[in-house]
Amino acid sequence: MKLRVQLEMVAACCLLAASSLAVGQGAAAKTASPADAVNAQLSLIEGEMMGAVKAMPAEKYSFAPSASVFVPSQKTVYPTGIRTFAQQATHVAQANYFFFSSVSGMKPDADVQAIAKLSNKDEIVAALAASFAFGHKAIATLTTANAFEVLKSNEPGLQTRATLSTFAVAHGFDHYGQMVEYLRMNGIVPPASAQ
């Protein structure tokens, strides 16, 4: 009986593999370039993050979580130096310029150091949007020929254009998750959750 069940499982796996191969052969004709693949992901985080920065009221841009927002019995210990909402957004903008200039070799089209000093909501929203636009231009330089060329990088594991560009997208999602919590702590439903 055990042998029969094992044979049925093997047969089922073979059928699944064969059907996957058949579907895969049809899809093989439709391949995306590295630029298209990464650009789609950058567009996703751009849409979500831009919605978040626009949703936060200007007077809440200085908000940062602290132990005071938690129930005292939780005994939450917060280190000093937690980024404000504004600092989260400016950090992502600066990081976009850093990562994507490394990916493409293009010089940033903004004063990256000055971004950290921004405190006005409209200026921060504009700087973040510009950093995403720069990212799209940089990603457009990715090709099948250069995506896995080794770059000079001090970051282990981020030595190719492909890994660095996908890390930039992941970095954005990390900070977007934190910004969503900031919105919720202020009673604001993130636009991506409201859809």
Residue ranges and their predicted role:
Residues E48-G51, A55, F134-T141, Q178:
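Solvent-exposed, charged/polar functional surfaces in cytosolic regulatory/catalytic domains
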Residues M1-Q6:
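N-terminal secretory signal peptides that target proteins for export/translocation
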Residues N39, S43-M50, S62-Q113, K152-Q195:
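Short, contiguous alpha-helical
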Residues A22-A29:
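Boundary at the C-terminal end of the N-terminal hydrophobic targeting segment
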Residues A116-K152, R161-H175:
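Acidic/histidine-rich alpha-helical segments that form the ligand environment
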Residues A29-A37:
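Terminal, regulation- and interaction-focused segments at domain boundaries
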Residues E8-A22:
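Bacterial N-terminal signal peptides
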Residues K54-F63, I139-F148, R184-P190:
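Surface-exposed helix-capping loop/turn segments at secondary-structure junctions
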